[in-house]
A protein has these predicted regions:
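Transmembrane beta-barrel wall of Gram-negative outer-membrane proteins
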Residues: 1-35
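C-terminal outer-membrane beta-barrel translocator/porin domains of Gram-negative envelope proteins
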Residues: 43-175, 179-182, 192-194
Length: 197
């Protein structure tokens, strides 16, 4: 349910059921005869989100402001089946529930015809419990991926239940719809999972 609050603001209530399936190896050393670990996570989620957005583009904006606050409750049942390279030997089942708080702010403090300077920050607080193994836990966590290309990779260093990322967007507009961008970010996980080998 979306509800407009002003010209650039909206409030959204969302309830959904989900069925997530992940096939993965817990090691880099595997052959074509090995079988993957398999984890399913079935459940439901409810969230409330407030967004104020006056950015001029959906991606790679160079003008405007963005503010997002999202609170999400997740409940579900995990079922993990170990593969041939897994240190676990038996199937695992566990109930999970957690709250996820996400805050994101972006503001272009200098906005000229040829030069734009923006500040961008994102913070996540997540009370997610551990899944049956390291990889399954990370796959279920929120990732820090402000660049769309990062969504296509599994980068464990940028997955953490509690983290903050902040950066500076330096943009030179050569002509309309053609920018040269230098985006620099700092990522700080407050809680990070370490794999024990």
């Amino acid at each position: 349910i979306k509800h407009p609050i002003a010209n650039t603001s909206k409030s959204t209530f969302d309830v959904r059921l989900f069925n997530l399936e992940d096939d993965y190896y817990q090691t880099d050393n595997f052959t074509n005869k090995d079988t993957t670990d398999f984890t399913t996570f079935n459940g439901g989620a409810g969230s409330w989100e407030f967004v104020q957005n006056s950015l001029n583009r959906k991606q790679f904006a160079n003008s405007g402001t963005f503010f997002q606050l999202k609170i999400r409750y997740v409940y579900g049942m995990e079922r993990s089946v170990p593969g041939s390279t897994s240190p676990q030997t038996s199937e695992f089942q566990k109930e999970h529930q957690w709250i996820n708080l996400n805050l994101e702010i972006q503001d272009f403090i200098i906005d000229n015809n040829f030069f734009h300077l923006g500040l961008h920050a994102r913070g996540v607080f997540n009370s997610q419990s551990l899944f049956s193994n390291y990889t399954a836990t990370l796959l279920a966590m929120t990732s820090f991926s402000l660049v769309p290309d990062a969504e296509t990779f599994f980068l464990p260093e940028y997955r953490s239940p509690q983290h903050l990322g902040a950066g500076i967007n330096t943009i030179f507009t050569v002509k309309k719809n053609f920018d040269i961008r230098f985006d620099t970010y700092y990522y700080q996980p407050f809680v990070q999972l370490i794999k024990n080998d």
